[in-house]
Amino acid sequence: MKIAVDAMGGDNAPAVVVEGVERARDRFKDIEFDLFGDPQQVRPLIKDATRINLIETTEMIEMGEEPVRAIRKKKDSSIVRAAVAVKEGQADAFFSAGNTGAILAAGLFIVGRIKGIDRPGLTSILPIAKPGSGAKNFVYLDSGANAESKEKNLLQFAQLGRFYAENVLGVNNPRIALLNNGTEEDKGDRLHKEVHQQLKAQGDLNFVGNVEASALLAGEADVIVSDGWTANAALKATEGTAKMMLTLIKNGIENGGLRAKLGYLFLKPVFKKIAKLMGTSTYGGAVLLGLKAPVVKTHGSADALAVENTIAQIHTMIESKVIEKTVSYFGQVQSEENIDKPSKN
């Protein structure tokens, strides 16, 4: 298998990208990499070029650029060239830590949607923080690709999330939940009420009802679906709360005197374990599900471990053939819908 990598994307690129790629190359003997970027910056960083091909690009899409305009104007950028390589069958997947909007636009307009999918969903893997929970993480989509969604989009997100949980996370009959402002069936606006009823009626989904944002990390479902605006706001609120708690704990230790500092020394291993559980480097990147090939974006501040784990995630996606299975499912659904349509004659 071959992965097309945007070597120039991210706050710490290309150094951490190259380091992460080399670590993944050593870990997975069946992966070859095409690194797209500026040879003058990238080549000196490569310690061992085994199964790493450096492909020169002359342009770069910056973090603040307008996404669609950027991919249309900068045809020789590392993001566009990597996406084109996937479209033309020269690579099996596309990975970047760069401009999120540009990656989404390149995935949508260059790699292309699966037939039958109206809108792809940005899919994050989040940790389950509840002690004693059997699962370690869950699938969360759409985490920001679509600010507005229709009922059909959320139903498709549920199916996309199901396939991902089954094939990539190895969850049997994953529990599907709808992010809402209450657990009761009649909660939410018209959209959420209607989606709830339609998810409930889906015979091939293990729908377990609504889940509130306060229970987002509680392990109540293996897949949580939402419109992109709500899901992104809930995710950022959760991240902000976690950061604030860490700040309060740190402040308490620093200003709590000798007793607090001694207590921290005893609890340091526990804090490290929690940091690893909640760390963004642990779970890989966000996948734009609903496209014809894996398009995966990790956060801009990613370190080499995050790059390595994101590539491991892509490796599992390719090995499990989750995209092929998704294509087959939605192709069948579309065929059935066409049969059910009344004839114009």
From Swiss-Prot:
Disulfide bonds: none annotated. PANTHER family: FATTY ACID/PHOSPHOLIPID SYNTHESIS PROTEIN PLSX (PTHR30100), PHOSPHATE ACYLTRANSFERASE (PTHR30100:SF1). It comes from the Bacteria. It catalyses: a fatty acyl-[ACP] + phosphate = an acyl phosphate + holo-[ACP]. Its EC number is 2.3.1.274. Catalyzes the reversible formation of acyl-phosphate (acyl-PO(4)) from acyl-[acyl-carrier-protein] (acyl-ACP). This enzyme utilizes acyl-ACP as fatty acyl donor, but not acyl-CoA. Keywords: Cytoplasm, Lipid biosynthesis, Lipid metabolism, Phospholipid biosynthesis, Phospholipid metabolism, Transferase. Pathway: Lipid metabolism; phospholipid metabolism. GO terms for biological process: fatty acid biosynthetic process; phospholipid biosynthetic process. It is an enzyme of class 2 (transferase). One of its GO terms (molecular function) is phosphate:acyl-[acyl carrier protein] acyltransferase activity. GO terms for cellular component: cytoplasm. Belongs to the PlsX family. This is Phosphate acyltransferase. It holds the Pfam family FA_synthesis. Homodimer. Probably interacts with PlsY. HAMAP family: PlsX (MF_00019). Signal peptide: none annotated. It is found in: Cytoplasm. Transmembrane segments: none annotated.
